[in-house]
C-alpha cells in the first residue's frame, strides 16, 4: 500500500527493497538438506539467510508502471513471526521525511485505514504480532537523502495481514449476489 501512495503523490522512479523475513516452514530447525537452495540447509534459528524472492515480479504485476524499475532482496532471520521491509526509493518530485510521513499517515487514517498502519512509537517486531494491517510504516525510521531518495521501514505480520486481506475480499464478494 505505501508504494501506491508514494507513486501517486511523488512519482516512484526506482526502488530496491530488502524484506527482512521471519523463518519459514521450508527451513530446518537444525542444519538439514534442502532441495533447491544450499543456504536453506542452515538452521532457521541460528542463521541469517539470503534467499531468492519474486517480490519485484509481484510489484510489477500490481503496479505495471513500475515493471523493470524495482529490485528486491529477501533475508530470512531467526525470529518466529513479524517481518519488515526496508525500502530505498527514488522519486520524481522533491520531498522531505516530514512530507513522506505526512502522506503515509494521511493515507493510513483515510482511504487505507485498516490496511496501512503508521507509528511513531519506539516498537520492535514482536509488537506487531497479529497486527491485521498489511504494513505499518515506522515513521521514526523514514529518511530522505538529498530531496529524492527515500528510505523507509515497514513492519508486517505476513500471514495475519494476508489472512485479513482475504477476509476483506470475501466480505466484499459476499455483497455481490
Q: What do the predicted segments below correspond to?
A:
Residues 129-177:
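NAD(P)-dependent Rossmann-like dehydrogenase/reductase catalytic/cofactor-binding core
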Residues 1-10:
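Alpha-helical support elements that line or immediately flank enzyme active sites
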Residues 1, 95, 161:
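Residues that form or flank phosphate/diphosphate-binding pockets in enzymes
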Residues 13-14, 19-150:
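C-terminal substrate-binding/catalytic lobe of Rossmann-fold NAD(P)-dependent oxidoreductases
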Amino acid at each position: 500500500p505505501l508504494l501506491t501512495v508514494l507513486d501517486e503523490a511523488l512519482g516512484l522512479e526506482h526502488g530496491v527493497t530488502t524484506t527482512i523475513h521471519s523463518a519459514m516452514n521450508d527451513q530446518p530447525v537444525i542444519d538439514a538438506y534442502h532441495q533447491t537452495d544450499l543456504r536453506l540447509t542452515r538452521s532457521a534459528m541460528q542463521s541469517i539467510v539470503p534467499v531468492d524472492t519474486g517480490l519485484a515480479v509481484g510489484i510489477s504485476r500490481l503496479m505495471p508502471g513500475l515493471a523493470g524499475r524495482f529490485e528486491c532482496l529477501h533475508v530470512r532471520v531467526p525470529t518466529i513471526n513479524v517481518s519488515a521491509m526496508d525500502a530505498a526509493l527514488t522519486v520524481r518530485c522533491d520531498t522531505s521525511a516530514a512530507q513522506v510521513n505526512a502522506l503515509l499517515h494521511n493515507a493510513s487514517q483515510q482511504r487505507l485505514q485498516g490496511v496501512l498502519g503508521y507509528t511513531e512509537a519506539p516498537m520492535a517486531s514482536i509488537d506487531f504480532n497479529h497486527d491485521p494491517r498489511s504494513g505499518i510504516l515506522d515513521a521514526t525510521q523514514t529518511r530522505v537523502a538529498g530531496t529524492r531518495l527515500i528510505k523507509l521501514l515497514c513492519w508486517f505480520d505476513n500471514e495475519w495481514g494476508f489472512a485479513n486481506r482475504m477476509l476483506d475480499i470475501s466480505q466484499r464478494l459476499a455483497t455481490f449476489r
